[in-house]
């Protein structure tokens, strides 16, 4: 989930 959240920032 954390990785997906990072993508959101990108």
Curated annotation (Swiss-Prot):
Keywords: Carbohydrate metabolism, Glycosidase, Hydrolase, Polysaccharide degradation
Signal peptide stretch: none
Keyword Hydrolase belongs to the record: yes
Lineage top rank: taxon: Bacteria
pH-related activity note: Optimum pH is 5.0.
UniProt enzyme class: hydrolase
Single GO biological process annotation from the record: polysaccharide catabolic process
A molecular function GO annotation: glucan 1,4-alpha-glucosidase activity
Temperature sensitivity of activity: Optimum temperature is 50 degrees Celsius.
Enzyme Commission (EC) number: 3.2.1.3
Catalytic activity: Hydrolysis of terminal (1->4)-linked alpha-D-glucose residues successively from non-reducing ends of the chains with release of beta-D-glucose
Record's miscellaneous remark: On the 2D-gel the determined pI of this protein is: 5.0, its MW is: 185 kDa.
Stated name of the protein: Glucoamylase
């Amino acid at each position: 989930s954390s990785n997906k959240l990072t993508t959101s920032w990108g």
